[in-house]
Amino acid sequence: MRLLLDMINWSFYNKSLVRRGEVILDFDVIDSWYSELDSMNDGKRGGQYHYPDSFIQLLGYMRVYFHLPYRQAEGVVIAHAGNKIPSIPNYSTINRRINNQDIRISERHEVGNDDDIIIALDSTGIKVANRGEWIRHKWHVRRGYLKIHVAVNIKNKKIISLEVTSEEVHDGKMLKKLIDNASANNNVKGALADGMYDSNKNFRYLSKNHIKPGIKTRSNSKVKTGNCQARNRSVMRQQTNLKRWKHSVSYGQRWMAETVFSSIKRTFGEYVTARKFQNMAKEMLLKASLYNMFAIGM
């Protein structure tokens, strides 16, 4: 632990944390207010937009970071930008526009357009309400949780694909969708995942797309003729020398996904405040998008 602390560039780390405050309260988006609105309303039928997307997304970031209700978000606008913008959006407008935003968490990665990347897949649970344990004990209400499925670039710890589902959805069923989304903007050449993703279907998908599998197979797995050959090879290699297999696929880097979950929960909390499922998903996308902006300081 002491060695790890000594390796951290504390000056750089501190500056990156300071930068978070600049990102959250960056009202410079106001400078492009009219040009952005002109672009958004060009060719639009019906009612016109009165507030640019970049401004609404900034309010969304402030909400999830500071845990602000919509009315307080309106108050922040009045206090910090009231004399700089033509009109103040009321809390219902902020609510509607934030939950209708197209939130993108993955653009072309900065390392280089042609770089190959390895991703780590995993999921975690997020509470659907922060009501306290006493309610569950007194009223016997099962709070439930969402499942957040992610694909993380192990090189920079950024989320490049995210899906939100109910708790009943099995991790393994999300592999294809996560990688399809990740591959839209990245050259995915390897995928690391635990035994929850172990299936012939997933191995066939990875093989078809020329993605090196780094999936931990079940301990009782057998090599069978009808199985996917890529999975059979992984089973044999893991049963012959598990340590060598882990080294060959960089399996130890799978913990990057767990690090991301830890950072998100520590930064934004372990719950969502929205009540509707689609709004819960939007809230998590906002958190993931903001996490990516913060990632260098995590």
Tell me the role of every PLM-derived stretch:
Residues 1-4, 195-266:
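Helix-centered, glycine/charged polyanion-binding patches within enzymatic domains
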Residues 1-11, 15-16, 54:
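Double-stranded DNA-binding cores of transcription factors and transposases
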Residues 5, 118, 190, 253-254:
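A residue-level structural signature of the nucleotidyltransferase/glycosyltransferase Rossmann-like core
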Residues 9, 41, 241:
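Basic DNA-binding region of bZIP-type proteins
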Residues 14-66:
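Basic, short loop/linker segments at the boundary and entry of helix-turn-helix/winged-helix-like folds
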Residues 44-57, 62-71, 75, 86-209, ...:
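Polybasic low-complexity intrinsically disordered regions
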Residues 53, 61, 242-298:
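Basic, amphipathic alpha-helical segments enriched in Lys/Arg and hydrophobic/aromatic residues
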Residues 78-79:
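Acidic/polar active-site rim loop that often engages polyanionic ligands
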